[in-house]
């Protein structure tokens, strides 16, 4: 089943010029893609290529300058109030900047309960039980429930944001560099959790990343973005080889898993 369909998406930002006139900076140019239920897809690209802007458009935080975004066959622009509430529940996003994504005055308990209070019909006791369950799933415990964001490490806060997104059992989870910043042990645990959710609920995942290792370990398909355009789409297999210049640059930037001894012909 197709969850998300994007066709001919373009976007720009206006900014003031030296002459006082507004100028438009193109960020996305004619982007089209589809995401299906249970699918794991990566959007790979260097910083500043338009990945995060695309993510903001997908979840409805901004409206595109041109093009169409449809969720389960319905254009986002035409969703009624009930459909929009269901959409906010079904598609969740975890941002790279976890500090800006939460209210620093709220406790972790309040942060986790917030989407459940607005998007689910659960009693308070059920919300608290699910909050504890989600914390455990991201390798945290109830000891953080009464803490506030400034009292947590960056990795802990990132996992709280992930737990918050998972609490409403979304159909699509968008992770904007949200897993790349975790250490490898935590990253592996989160990936196991996401795989379990896919099997249980058919949750689709869109990884917005520049981390090629993450793509190779978890994703079924990868799209390469460069200068606001998707320049290549590949199925992830045993050996991932890119044909675009942007894809090859990212692939060549990955360090080998083990040090490679440099051969020399010089005699000592």
Curated annotation (Swiss-Prot):
Residues that, per the record, bind ATP: 45-52
Entry EC no(s): 7.2.2.11
Organism in which the protein naturally occurs: Escherichia coli (strain K12)
GO MF term set: ABC-type nickel transporter activity; ATP binding; ATP hydrolysis activity; nickel cation binding
A Gene Ontology cellular-component term: membrane
SUPFAM superfamilies: P-loop containing nucleoside triphosphate hydrolases (SSF52540)
Protein name per the record: Nickel import ATP-binding protein NikE
Gene (name only): nikE
Record family assignment: Belongs to the ABC transporter superfamily. Nickel importer (TC 3.A.1.5.3) family.
Subcellular location: Cell inner membrane
Catalytic activity as recorded in UniProt: Ni(2+)(out) + ATP + H2O = Ni(2+)(in) + ADP + phosphate + H(+)
Function field: Part of the ABC transporter complex NikABCDE involved in nickel import. Responsible for energy coupling to the transport system.
Origin: domain of life: Bacteria
InterPro entries membership: AAA+_ATPase, ABC_transp_ATP-bind, ABC_transporter-like_ATP-bd, ABC_transporter-like_CS, Nickel_NikE, P-loop_NTPase
Pfam families named in the record: ABC_tran (PF00005)
């Amino acid at each position: 089943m197709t969850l998300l369909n994007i066709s001919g998406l373009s976007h720009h930002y206006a900014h003031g010029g030296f002459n006082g006139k507004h100028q438009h900076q193109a960020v996305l140019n004619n982007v089209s893609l589809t995401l299906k239920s249970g699918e794991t897809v990566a959007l790979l690209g260097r910083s500043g290529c338009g990945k995060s802007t695309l993510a903001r458009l997908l979840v409805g935080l901004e409206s595109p300058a041109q093009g169409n975004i449809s969720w389960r066959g319905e254009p986002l622009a035409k969703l009624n109030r009930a459909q929009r509430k269901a959409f906010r529940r079904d598609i969740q996003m975890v941002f790279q900047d976890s500090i800006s994504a939460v209210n620093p005055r709220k406790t972790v308990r309040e942060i986790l309960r917030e989407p459940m209070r607005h998007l689910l019909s659960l009693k308070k006791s059920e919300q608290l039980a699910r909050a504890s369950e989600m914390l455990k799933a991201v390798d945290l415990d109830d000891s953080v429930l009464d803490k506030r964001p400034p009292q947590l490490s960056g990795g802990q806060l990132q996992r709280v944001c992930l737990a918050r997104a998972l609490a409403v059992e979304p159909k699509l989870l968008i992770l904007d560099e949200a897993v790349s910043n975790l250490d490898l042990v935590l990253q592996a645990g989160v990936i196991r959790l996401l795989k379990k959710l896919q099997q249980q609920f058919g949750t689709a995942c869109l990884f917005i990343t520049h981390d090629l290792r993450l793509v190779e370990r978890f994703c079924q398909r990868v799209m390469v973005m460069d200068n606001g355009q998707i320049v290549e789409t590949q199925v992830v297999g045993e050996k991932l080889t890119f044909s675009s210049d942007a894809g090859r640059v990212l692939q060549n930037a990955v360090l080998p898993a083990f040090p490679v001894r440099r051969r020399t012909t010089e005699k000592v």
